[in-house]
């Protein structure tokens, strides 16, 4: 029986994701997260499952191209990159919001106050383009790979769209959240071909993870 290969997200999601996988028997309880986080590829001899560790934005790429059978990443990542994958489970962890935020000094009260052709800094250009097009607002989207909240401070952008969990970072930088574009949480996705070839194995694993999520041991976030 071939092992199931899962792409796991490095960073803030990893700890909560590993907890769920341990509870579901997907990964051994004796596996140390600190040891695991330093590896790129890991095989769990007890469960016979294999894991790849990748940046959250790269997880869908590994799954779509068949390097991994399963993957776990945020809904925000899936929406931005639009990969052809089956989304199987909302793990209910890693909850955050993708929000439109503006400097307090601008005095904007709503999206309607944002001038045409304002510059919007974000790590999610595709989501942002669709959002503002849907609102009928013409903007210039500037893609950044991190520290998006810096953009208004140096006059690179008038508006930002960024992930916010608690709102603390926005507040520290005098940014006011104006509107939520999407609420995100960690999702389990599967490669379309793998789901057919390894259907029994993958279905059993998904069912176990679903049981843990529905048991209340992890907080459930609705789609």
UniProtKB/Swiss-Prot annotation:
Family to which this protein belongs: Belongs to the ATP phosphoribosyltransferase family. Short subfamily.
Main location, first listed in the record: cytoplasm
Protein name in the entry: ATP phosphoribosyltransferase
Entry annotated with the keyword Manganese: no
GO process terms (BP): L-histidine biosynthetic process
Superkingdom, taxonomy of origin: Bacteria
UniProt GO molecular function: ATP binding; ATP phosphoribosyltransferase activity
Cross-referenced SUPFAM superfamilies: Periplasmic binding protein-like II
UniProt-listed PROSITE patterns: ATP_P_PHORIBOSYLTR
Reactions catalysed according to its record: 1-(5-phospho-beta-D-ribosyl)-ATP + diphosphate = 5-phospho-alpha-D-ribose 1-diphosphate + ATP
This protein's encoding gene: hisG
EC number(s) reported in the record: 2.4.2.17
Keywords: Amino-acid biosynthesis, ATP-binding, Cytoplasm, Glycosyltransferase, Histidine biosynthesis, Nucleotide-binding, Transferase
Subcellular locations according to the entry: Cytoplasm
Listed Gene3D superfamilies: Periplasmic binding protein-like II
Subunit composition and interactions: Heteromultimer composed of HisG and HisZ subunits.
Pathway entry: Amino-acid biosynthesis; L-histidine biosynthesis; L-histidine from 5-phospho-alpha-D-ribose 1-diphosphate: step 1/9
Transmembrane listed as a keyword: no
GO CC aspect terms: cytoplasm
Gene source species: Halothermothrix orenii (strain H 168 / OCM 544 / DSM 9562)
Domain free text: Lacks the C-terminal regulatory region which is replaced by HisZ.
NCBIfam families per UniProt: hisG
General function of this protein: Catalyzes the condensation of ATP and 5-phosphoribose 1-diphosphate to form N'-(5'-phosphoribosyl)-ATP (PR-ATP). Has a crucial role in the pathway because the rate of histidine biosynthesis seems to be controlled primarily by regulation of HisG enzymatic activity.
